[in-house]
């Protein structure tokens, strides 16, 4: 089914330097309007972050594409997402790997995301209501960890759950935030600063 708005979004992402055909195809295939409030549907394919309630947002499509591309995913990659939010980033990951593990601290957001994923026939996702700072150690280690909220510093518990050779993409900072790619190599963590970003804060604890 033709979607001119999705076509234009993919063209924009390509112009912004996103090159992975798999990432672009996953974003093109997903109806972003399904993950936003009805009042925001007319902006669903704009390159903007949009509110989803509970003080949280759905990230702008460029950031979703960039973070996903940085993880260099293959179908076998074992992925942990911190911050399920609307479920949009989760759905993009689920199009690219065999299984996604995702943690959300706000119960109502977790429920809504699970409902959306089910309605889109996306079943290769395990969701957990819990503290994102703690990750999901019982299911680790992970080849890739994607964090969708900004931490003042990288949580050690998440570094501990990264497999050898694994990649983490995480926004770090408070007033000034930067996206980092962290690779675990031989017991060390190699950190690369990618670009300036703006995310909601990664809050410890969970909410009913």
Swiss-Prot record:
Disulfide-bond pairs as recorded: none
Keyword Cytoplasm found: yes
Catalytic activity: [protein]-L-isoaspartate + S-adenosyl-L-methionine = [protein]-L-isoaspartate alpha-methyl ester + S-adenosyl-L-homocysteine
Entry GO terms, CC: cytoplasm
GO molecular function, one term: protein-L-isoaspartate (D-aspartate) O-methyltransferase activity
Family: Belongs to the methyltransferase superfamily. L-isoaspartyl/D-aspartyl protein methyltransferase family.
Name of the protein described by the UniProt record: Protein-L-isoaspartate O-methyltransferase
Species of provenance: Vibrio cholerae serotype O1 (strain ATCC 39541 / Classical Ogawa 395 / O395)
Organismal lineage: Bacteria, Pseudomonadati, Pseudomonadota, Gammaproteobacteria, Vibrionales
Name of the gene this protein is made from: pcm
């Amino acid at each position: 089914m033709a979607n001119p708005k999705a076509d234009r979004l993919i063209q924009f992402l390509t112009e912004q330097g996103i090159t992975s055909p798999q990432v672009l195809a996953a974003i093109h295939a997903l109806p972003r309007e399904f993950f936003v409030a009805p009042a925001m549907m007319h902006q669903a394919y704009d390159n903007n972050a949009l509110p989803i309630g509970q003080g949280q947002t759905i990230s702008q499509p460029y950031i979703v594409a960039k973070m996903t591309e940085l993880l260099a995913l293959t179908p076998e990659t074992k992925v942990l997402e911190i911050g399920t939010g609307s479920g949009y980033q989760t759905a993009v990951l689920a199009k690219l790997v065999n299984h996604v593990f995702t943690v959300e601290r706000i119960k109502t957001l977790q429920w809504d995301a699970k409902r959306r994923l089910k309605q889109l026939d996306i079943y290769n996702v395990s969701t957990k209501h819990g503290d994102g700072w703690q990750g999901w150690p019982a299911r680790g280690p992970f080849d890739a960890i994607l964090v969708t909220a900004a931490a003042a510093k990288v949580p050690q518990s998440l570094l501990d759950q990264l497999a050898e050779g694994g990649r983490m993409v995480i926004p770090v900072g408070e007033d000034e935030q930067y996206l980092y790619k962290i690779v675990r190599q031989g017991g060390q963590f190699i950190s690369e600063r990618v670009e300036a970003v703006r995310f909601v804060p990664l809050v410890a604890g969970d909410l009913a």
